[in-house]
C-alpha cells in the first residue's frame, strides 16, 4: 500500500452542479486500486453544494474559521449535519474558542453523535498534529449514513443524465415544448 506519498490533482468542476466533479469518484476508485490508503478531497468552498462530497467521501471534515457570521453558518448547515469532525482553524484569532463552543452546543442539540470539534492554528502550528491524529483514527460516526446515500443517489442520477447520449436531443425537445420534464427524466433516466 502507499502510505507516505502525496499525490495532488486539481480537477475542474465542469458539468457538475456541486463542488465535486463527477469524475472524482472514478479517480478515487482508481487510486484505491493502485493501493493508495487515503485519498483527501478538498472542495471549492462552503455552502449547500458542498453536501455532494458525501456522495464519494467516507469521512467528512469541515474546516471553519473563527468569527463566521450566521449567514455562513446557515449556508454550511447541511454540510455540518454530515461532518464526522470539525476543525476551527486560525485559533490564534479572536473568537475561535467561542466559535468552537457554539458548534459543540449546536451539535449537542441535534440527534446522534457529536463529532469532535478541534482548534488548530496552522500559522502557529498549534493543535495540527493532535487534529491529524484524531482524523487518522476517525471511525464512521454513522450519524449521516442516510444523508450520504441520498447524496450518492443524487450524484449517480445526475451523472447518468449528463452522460446520456440523448441529452442534447432532450434539451432541444424541452426548449420547444414537445416533451414534459417528466418525459425527459424518463428518457434520460432509462425508464
Language-model features: locations:
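Short, conserved loop/helix-junction motifs that constitute active-site signature segments
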Residues: 55, 79-82
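Nucleotide-state-sensitive switch-loop elements of NTP-binding domains
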Residues: 1-49, 53-56, 62
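Residue-level signature of catalytic and energy-coupling elements of molecular machines
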Residues: 24, 42, 79, 89, ...
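Long, well-ordered amphipathic alpha-helical subdomains in the mid-to-C-terminal portions
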Residues: 119, 130-191
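Canonical P-loop GTPase G-domain recognition
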Residues: 82-85, 91-141
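Conserved nucleotide-binding/hydrolysis micro-motifs of P-loop NTPases
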Residues: 13-16, 45-48, 66-70, 91-94, ...
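Conserved ATPase-coupling elements of RecA-like P-loop NTPase cores
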Residues: 20, 47-53, 71-74, 95-99
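Hydrophobic/aromatic beta-strand patches that form the interior of the parallel beta-sheet core
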Residues: 7-9, 59-61, 84-87, 118
